[in-house]
Swiss-Prot record:
Top-level taxon: Bacteria
Pfam families listed in its UniProt record: Aminotran_3
Record protein name field: Succinylornithine transaminase
Enzyme Commission code(s) on record: 2.6.1.81
Keywords noted in UniProt: Aminotransferase, Arginine metabolism, Pyridoxal phosphate, Transferase
Function noted in UniProt: Catalyzes the transamination of N(2)-succinylornithine and alpha-ketoglutarate into N(2)-succinylglutamate semialdehyde and glutamate. Can also act as an acetylornithine aminotransferase.
Organism listed in the record: Yersinia pseudotuberculosis serotype I (strain IP32953)
Swiss-Prot/TrEMBL catalytic activity: N(2)-succinyl-L-ornithine + 2-oxoglutarate = N-succinyl-L-glutamate 5-semialdehyde + L-glutamate
Residues recorded as bearing N6-(pyridoxal phosphate)lysine in the entry: 260
Entry's Gene Ontology BP terms: alpha-amino acid biosynthetic process; arginine catabolic process to glutamate; arginine catabolic process to succinate; ornithine catabolic process
Functional pathway: Amino-acid degradation; L-arginine degradation via AST pathway; L-glutamate and succinate from L-arginine: step 3/5
């Protein structure tokens, strides 16, 4: 076989559409929570592919599941069903409130399906009913949310920087203030078909919802016959120390969307709901070519079975505290964080006023010392590592973060 031609970081700028600005190194290999670049430099991974690699890189059981299914059948199309998709659906149903599942390929697709379902259910059940003033097709979302990059989901996201250049945008979407129940109550009416919310706003700064806020949304949706949609793309599949974050709050949604960690690095998305609401979608009303393919579902089934274990989920909560304790020590030395927030292994370090706007600079500096981390806006350094990252890796990774912080501090104070 012919050897592949050499590529460099410059190749990205030459050949790819510039929708991203990746780091100046190229990762070529990963094992557990360690990555290596083309030059052989190692990095501890606190990013996890943005909350995707929940079991790290190259987990032997996940790899085995991929190889086993690859030797059978990869793809069939939606004219046929397959064993892995049926088994994965049953796993999700047994583990959650759901009774029905729709599989797709990404979080954006899952949210698109959820919003379409909400409008279709409202059309079927409330159109032209006595006492109904106006069409029941309005969607309430929240500012600084992130629900994907399709035109529908990016409009729901409530971040103009992602949507303002693509007008005209889909209508009928209204944005309230996250964690402000009065704001939501003002927007949710009998014309509302759905409320979509993240239990923790990830891209919006790792901001957890208040328990009272989510319970209040549940009550408002019940009062106005609107579907409550929980976007758990980033918080799902063990990320917060429960299989799904709604389980912390004692409130169940009508629809839940999942992706990212569900495949452990293999693309897959899912929309979970009840029989009552799923009945709104009939044959041909929605679909996707690759959704529910046997290769993705075989991998996801293994990932889910490994993560949905009491010991592993308890370990996520323990690791959260390890992070918090080490970060407190870093902050005692450098005084850069105003707040550390999040749940489980979705953690946001909010920079104080002196270091406002420098999250990207800190992450880039830390990479020089061998740490891969994330940002959640200009003022928040974000971590979403493997759920089974070791105590040693946490300690070493945060030591590398501290070196990056010290480098930035010297610039700020000099």
């Amino acid at each position: 076989m012919e050897q592949p031609s050499p590529v460099t970081r410059q190749s990205f700028d030459e050949w790819l559409v510039p929708t991203y600005a990746p780091a100046d190194f190229i990762v070529v290999r990963g094992e557990g929570s360690t990555l290596w670049d083309q030059q052989g430099k190692s990095y501890i991974d606190f990013a996890g592919g943005i909350a995707v690699n929940a079991l790290g890189h190259g987990h032997p059981a996940v790899r085995a599941a991929l190889i086993e299914q690859a030797d059978k059948v990869w793809h069939l199309g939606n004219g046929y069903t397959n064993e892995p998709v049926l088994r994965l659906a049953k796993q999700l149903i047994d583990a959650t409130f759901a009774e029905k599942v729709f599989f797709c390929n990404s979080g954006a697709e899952a949210n698109e399906a959820a919003l379409k379902l909400a409008r279709k259910y409202a059309l079927d059940n409330f159109a032209n009913k006595a006492g109904q003033q106006g069409e029941k097709n309005q969607i309430v979302a929240f500012r600084n949310a992130f629900h994907g990059r399709t035109l529908f989901t990016v409009s729901a996201g409530g971040q103009p920087k992602y949507s303002q250049d693509f007008a005209p945008l889909p209508g009928g979407i209204h944005h309230g203030i996250f964690n402000d129940l009065a704001s939501a109550e003002h927007l949710i009416t009998d014309q509302t078909c759905a409320v979509i919310v993240e239990p923790i706003q990830g891209e919006g700064g790792v901001l957890p919802a208040d328990k009272e806020f989510l319970h209040g949304l549940r009550a408002l949706c019940d009062r106005h016959n609107a579907l409550l949609i929980f976007d758990e793309i980033q918080t799902g599949v063990g990320r917060t120390g429960e299989l799904y974050a709604y389980m912390h709050y004692g409130v169940s949604p009508d629809v839940l969307t999942s992706a990212k960690a569900l495949g452990g690095g293999f693309p897959i998305g899912a929309m979970l709901t009840t029989t009552k609401y799923a009945s709104a979608l009939s044959v041909g009303s929605h679909g996707t070519t690759f959704g529910g393919n046997p290769l993705a579902c075989a991998v996801a089934g293994t990932v889910l079975s490994l993560i949905n274990q009491p010991t592993l989920l308890a370990g996520v909560k323990a690791r959260h505290q390890w992070f918090i304790d080490e970060l407190a020590e870093i902050n005692a030395r450098h005084n850069v964080f105003a707040e550390i927030r999040g749940r489980g292994l979705l953690i946001g370090c909010v920079l104080n006023a002196q270091y406002a706007g420098k999250s990207k600079e800190i992450v880039q500096a830390a990479a020089q010392y061998g740490l891969i981390a994330l940002i959640a806006g200009p003022d928040v350094v974000r971590f979403a590592p493997s759920l089974i990252i070791s105590p040693k890796e946490i300690k070493e990774g945060l030591a590398r973060l501290a070196m990056g912080i010290e480098q930035v501090c010297q610039k700020v104070t000099s």
